Every structure is written in structure tokens, then in C-alpha cells.
């Protein structure tokens, strides 16, 4: 079953239908579904699909030759081309009169094994593109390699591509499509636990409770995910121990560079380079208060939900998990799940806000959204706003998100109203998001104010999943 990626498929099909030479670059983290996307795209098309392996040039060339032989007739079985140049020239020959897709998956493995691969492709593209019906797709999981050696200005292939796609994990809406039997609340928890990476979503079983899924997948040493974060780091970086320490520090509450450096016992200059690599891998993101330039107020957060959950709960409980004390480990995790879900709920609420905007239903036509934190000059205390976005210098929205089992009280609305006055906007709209609902007092005050939207999680879930209800 293939889910989502409608825009990416539309782009690929548009390129294919041009019937002229096209060169698409597809890249993204491991497990996000790049190969599944390509396989779905070429399933009804003439195509040569070759996946590079982490081996030498000879092995990769033999595998590439085999892929070509499986498509083309007139080549003796067991034949191997003498070089990648000869092999690719042969494929260009096949594309003189027919539309053919050539896919080189895990391209970084091939290019590292064959140092002349990029310049060979450059030469052959320049020579044949004007008279070729080839659609070339280069795909890779090493994002730094693809960005530096395929997409970058100094790369040999720069200027040859006709499209590029960075494949990201699914958002909450598309993640929901994987399941039919989870309740709305359980679906939020599942998204908070594994995020939108297809390979991780497939580990979840909607015939089981969230508790049993956590026990079966995260608290089970035999599961595919149990060592996934550490294994992925080993594949991507040279010093996984330091990266592990950094991610653990962020997951357990250290958010500023100085705090992280102190926590792991390294200097901030050393930490900053590691952090840059983690950002490039899509595992960490740097956040700055909305509307402000990068400053000392910038903080770091884990960008991937599965990594966030794993590093928040597994390392501290690793010893008892390894000894089979699943129930004890879950007993330690369960009381912290509601607090953990707070930031996940903010993320879901922002996705809701973006859909409102795209559907033309947002009361404020913002250009961006983000969190804000800083000092309240009147009370001289640190404060924060969960969601903020502005349309122009006079119009903005502010949001507060509460993942709690009680109805949200009017005091929360009053606090949000007060925080919004830290900024000099003439027109302000307030959003209160609640897991459960709102007290009567909160509902009445929102009605009096007239510039407030009260939105429950159930409404968000129904709206994001196109169940035909009003936005709020």
C-alpha cells in the first residue's frame, strides 16, 4: 500500500510527460520512503532501476550492468560493461527513440566508489541531453553528500538537474492515513512517538493499544526500532558517541548551546560543529524567537519525533529494558507522556493553522509561524507564546496549546491576551487549543472578546483529515 506523496508524484509525472531529457535529484533521510516513491512512480513505466551498494567500483558496475541486462535485449547474460561511462552511454543509446527512466538509487555509494562518476555523468548529459528521451533520477540518503556533491554550485552536476526533491517525513495528516482503528487521541500519541517516517509508522499496530505498542516496539530489545537511532547515527557520522550525548542532552532538557556543552563536557565551539551536522541530518533544529534574528536566545530541539521519544525515555531505562522489565520501564515512562505530548500538540496545532491558511479560512493571513520566548518587561520574568504569526506590522495571531485532561480555564485566555500585548499590533486574533475542551467561563469570555477561536483537538483531527466539519 502506497500512501501520500501526491505532490512529489505529480512532479515526477510532469517531468516524465515532457518526453525530453529530464534529470531529477531526490534525497532525504533514511527510512522516509524515497525508494518507495520511486518504485511507485516507475511501476507502469519502462525503467532501469539500480541501487548502489557500499562496496567497490567493480561490484557496483557489475550490479549496474545486471540492471541494464534485465531491461535490454541483445546483451549476453553475465556481461559486464568495462566502465560506468560505457554503461551509461549504452542507456543513452536506448533512449534515443523511446522514453526510459534510469534510476540510480543510493548514488553516494556509487560516486564514492567510482571517483569519476560525477564528471562522467556531466559529460554524457551535456553530450546527449538535446536528443535524448531519458529521464534520469539520482537518489541518495546521505543528505550532506547530495547537497555538497550534486546540488552545490561547485559540484560537477550543478546546473544539469531539472528538478530536485527533498523528501521529508509525513505530517500528522498523512501519518493518520496509515491507520484505521486508532482513536483520535491515540493517533496524536502515535505521531508523538514515531513521527511521520513511514518505516517507523509501519512498526505500529492499530489493533493494539498505544501502551502495548510502546512496550512491543520501544521496550523490546528484539524490535526493529530498539537500536534504530544509534544504528542510524553509526551509518551517518564518524563519532556516534558524541552525537548520542548531544541528542540525549537536548532530549532531557538542555536547549541552549552553553547548556548542551556543559552537559556533555565539551566546548561550545566543538559542540557547534556536531550540532551543524545533526541539523543537516534533519535530527535537530535550531529555533529562534518568532520575528527575531539569530541570537543568543536561539535554542535547539529534536526535530524527529521518534528520536525525541527514544532519547527522552530509552537511555535512562536501558538497563531494566535489557533485563526484560518491560512493565517497570513503562511504569516509569507513563507519568511523563502528557508532559512529553505538549510540544507534539503545538506541532499539530501549527499544521492545523497552515491548513486554515491554505484553505482561505484563517482570520490572519500570516506569512510564517513560530514560537516566541523572551522577557516580560513589566513583570520582569521569562515568558513564552506557543504559536505566533503576523500578516503585517499591524495584524497578528497568538496561540496557546494545552494538552491536559481538564477543560481549559478562562485564566489561560487572560494570560494569552496579556502576553499578546507585549507586541504593538493593532489587530490581534487569539487561538486557544485544548486537548479536551473549555470551561463555561472561558467560552463566555471568548464570546465577549470576539477575536478568539477556541479549538479542541477533536476539531483539529477532523479538520486535518477532511471530515467535512468547519475549521473552528
Per-region residue spans from a language model:
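A cross-kingdom feature that marks ATP-driven nucleic-acid transaction machinery
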Residues: 290, 299-472
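Phosphate-binding site recognition
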Residues: 1-330
Amino acid at each position: 500500500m502506497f500512501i501520500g506523496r501526491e505532490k512529489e508524484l505529480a512532479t515526477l509525472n510532469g517531468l516524465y510527460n515532457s518526453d525530453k531529457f529530464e534529470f531529477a535529484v531526490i534525497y532525504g533521510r533514511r527510512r522516509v520512503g524515497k525508494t518507495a516513491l520511486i518504485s511507485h512512480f516507475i511501476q507502469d513505466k519502462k525503467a532501469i532501476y539500480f541501487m548502489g551498494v557500499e562496496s567497490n567500483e567493480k561490484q557496483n558496475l557489475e550490479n549496474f550492468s545486471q540492471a541494464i541486462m534485465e531491461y535490454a535485449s541483445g546483451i549476453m547474460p553475465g556481461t559486464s560493461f568495462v566502465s560506468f561511462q560505457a554503461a551509461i552511454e549504452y542507456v543513452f543509446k536506448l533512449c534515443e527513440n523511446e522514453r526510459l527512466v534510469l534510476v540510480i538509487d543510493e548514488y553516494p555509494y556509487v560516486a564514492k566508489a567510482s571517483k569519476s562518476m560525477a564528471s562522467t555523468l556531466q559529460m554524457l548529459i551535456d553530450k546527449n541531453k538535446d536528443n535524448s528521451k531519458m529521464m534520469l533520477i539520482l537518489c541518495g540518503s546521505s543528505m550532506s553528500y547530495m547537497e555538497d556533491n550534486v546540488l552545490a554550485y561547485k559540484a560537477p552536476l550543478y546546473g544539469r538537474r531539472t528538478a530536485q526533491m527533498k523528501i521529508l517525513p509525513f505530517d500528522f495528516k498523512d501519518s493518520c492515513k496509515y491507520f484505521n482503528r486508532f482513536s483520535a487521541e491515540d493517533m496524536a500519541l502515535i505521531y508523538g512517538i514515531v513521527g511521520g517516517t513511514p518505516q517507523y509508522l509501519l512498526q505500529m499496530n492499530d489493533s493494539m493499544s498505544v501502551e502495548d505498542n510502546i512496550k512491543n516496539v520501544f521496550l523490546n530489545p528484539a524490535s526493529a526500532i530498539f537500536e534504530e537511532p544509534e544504528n542510524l547515527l553509526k551509518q551517518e557520522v564518524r563519532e556516534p558517541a558524541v552525537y548520542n550525548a548531544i541528542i540525549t542532552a537536548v532530549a532531557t532538557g538542555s536547549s541552549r548551546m552553553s547548556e548542551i556543552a556543559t552537559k556533555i563536557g565539551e566546548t561550545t565551539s566543538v559542540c557547534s560543529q556536531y550540532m551543524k551536522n545533526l541539523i543537516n541530518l534533519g535530527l535537530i533544529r535550531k529555533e529562534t524567537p518568532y520575528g527575531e534574528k539569530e541570537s543568543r536566545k536561539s535554542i535547539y530541539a529534536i526535530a524527529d519525533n521518534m528520536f525525541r521519544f527514544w532519547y527522552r525515555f530509552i537511555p535512562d531505562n536501558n538497563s531494566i529494558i535489557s533485563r526484560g522489565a518491560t512493565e517497570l520501564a513503562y511504569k516509569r515512562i507513563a507519568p511523563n507522556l502528557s508532559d512529553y505530548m505538549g510540544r507534539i500538540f503545538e506541532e499539530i496545532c501549527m499544521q492545523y493553522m497552515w491548513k486554515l491558511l491554505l484553505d482561505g479560512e484563517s482570520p490572519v493571513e500570516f506569512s510564517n509561524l513560530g514560537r516566541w520566548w523572551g522577557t516580560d518587561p513589566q513583570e520582569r520574568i521569562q515568558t513564552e507564546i506557543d504559536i505566533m504569526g503576523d500578516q503585517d506590522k499591524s495584524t497578528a495571531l497568538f496561540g496557546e496549546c494545552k494538552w491536559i485532561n481538564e477543560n481549559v480555564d478562562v485564566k489561560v485566555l487572560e494570560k494569552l491576551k496579556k502576553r499578546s500585548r507585549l507586541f504593538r499590533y493593532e489587530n490581534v486574533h487569539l487561538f486557544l487549543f485544548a486537548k479536551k475542551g473549555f470551561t463555561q467561563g472561558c467560552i463566555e469570555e471568548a464570546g465577549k472578546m470576539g477575536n478568539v477561536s477556541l479549538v479542541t483537538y477533536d476539531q483539529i483531527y477532523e479538520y486535518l483529515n477532511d471530515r467535512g466539519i468547519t475549521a473552528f
